Amino acid sequence: MVFLFTLLNYIIIILLTLWLLTSLKQNIETKPPLPSPTPTPTPSPTPTPTPSPTPTPTPTPTPTPTPTPSPTPTPALSPTPTPSPTLSPTPSPTPTPSPTPSPTPSPTPTPSPTPSPTPTPSPTPSPTPTPSPTPTPSPTPSPTPSPTPTPSPTPSPTPTPSPTPSPTPTPSPTPSPTPPPSPTPPPSPSPLGDPMYFPSSVGTTDQLRDYIRPLCNGWPRPRETYAVPWDCQRVMHCSYFSLPLHEVTCNDDSAYSFTADGCVPHYQSDCPFYPLNTL
């Protein structure tokens, strides 16, 4: 029974709260229409102050009547407080009229016209162009340099000697024939080097090879080629393309510079060998 009783109490409380909520909603819905018309008239007077700047450009005394219309909006605000006690949320729109004082700074632009006369003095420096006549004398000196160019034609005869150097290049072709004599030095016996002597006991190619082998390896700067004394055109090379002590014939092998006109003495041949003479 106690449980049922408590349930009934809860149901009653819920019903009461619902009823209160609905009644409050109805009151709120009915009352907002009243403040809604009030804000509409209040903004309408605010645009009216905009015409007030128009009188300011005309005479300066006109700004004095502008304060007189300012009290007229104040009675329009007086009816607005009457709805404010009816609803607590309405005070939020009431601050909106505060922007109305903002138009009052509009008279401050009036000083701006006063600086406008200040630019007028800027034209006063315009008399400065008076120095412009002074540059006019400067053109008068310019004719004076004109006589100076007249001596310039006098150097013109000096270029006439320039043709005289032209004959000098003609001797330059004379050195060009000098290169042809350069081929003449090859026949000289200078590449032969100093003659080298070998013992008279050496009489065959094998004996000569055995005699030359230590000479190819032992000297600090070993000779590369040696002439065979019993053959005018045969040369013994220490290392002929990695072949040790290879015999080369000057007339047949193109690896050497040689004369192919028969057997000639070693001192006349241009083969790069060192002649060997018998002791």
Swiss-Prot record:
Keywords: Disulfide bond. The keyword Disulfide bond applies. Residues 31-203 are annotated as: Disordered. It comes from the Viruses. One of its GO terms (molecular function) is chitin binding. Residues 32-192 have a biased composition (Pro residues). The keyword Disulfide bond applies. One of its GO terms (cellular component) is extracellular region. Residues 213-273 form the Chitin-binding type-2 domain. Signal peptide: none annotated. This is Uncharacterized 29.3 kDa protein. Disulfide bonds join C250-C263. InterPro entries: Chitin-bd_dom (IPR002557), DUF5478 (IPR020151), SDr-like (IPR050972).
